[in-house]
Amino acid sequence: MGRRPARCYRYIKNKPYPKSRFCRGVPDAKIRIFDLGNKRANVDTFPACVHMMSNEREHLSSEALEAARICANKYMVKNCGKDGFHLRVRKHPFHVTRINKMLSCAGADRLQTGMRGAYGKPQGLVARVDIGDILFSMRIKEGNVKHAIEAFRRAKFKFPGRQIIVSSRKWGFTKWDREDYERMRAEGRLRSDGVGVQLQREHGPLTKWIENPI
């Protein structure tokens, strides 16, 4: 018997059901890689950022996340090179779906009890997403924004429901707008920390702060 289609588990109707000591025997998620491309690139290498956001409250299967990841990665490697972008999958499949297997052979009514004791066994993993949740993020150079948008447009076809693609006003994966980031970097208030940056806060005695307030 093949895998039950993910359309059977599309809508969020119940509570989160993660893997635990009470929920055992859960199959591994199909998606195992959540960071792709030039993930060691410094924060100043890729100033632009593009997001794929969900516009629907639903479940996304781990198979769909993996298919979309492969699709976006393949297009970006072909058009920008394997070191020309950094793609990050922002949603993880933690919710376990169950299946109550039914026999369809002759004499099945003698072997099974129908809907008596119908609590199923773990079947797969899905990610619970809401409206406005970010599914994928990609940081790139300014000249490659159009390629990132096209990669996400192709990846959208792997998902049910509606998604929107937005170009972020932030600098890369940081939390600051580009103008604020460039100003603080020029002032020497930002210290590079891999993919992100750390804000150098004002430390020292109170008398110094009173003389030169922030």
Curated annotation (Swiss-Prot):
GO terms for biological process: translation. CDD domains: Ribosomal_L16_L10e. Gene3D superfamilies: Ribosomal protein L10e/L16 (3.90.1170.10). PROSITE patterns: RIBOSOMAL_L10E. SUPFAM superfamilies: Ribosomal protein L16p/L10e (SSF54686). Disulfide bonds: none annotated. This is Large ribosomal subunit protein uL16. It comes from Caenorhabditis elegans.
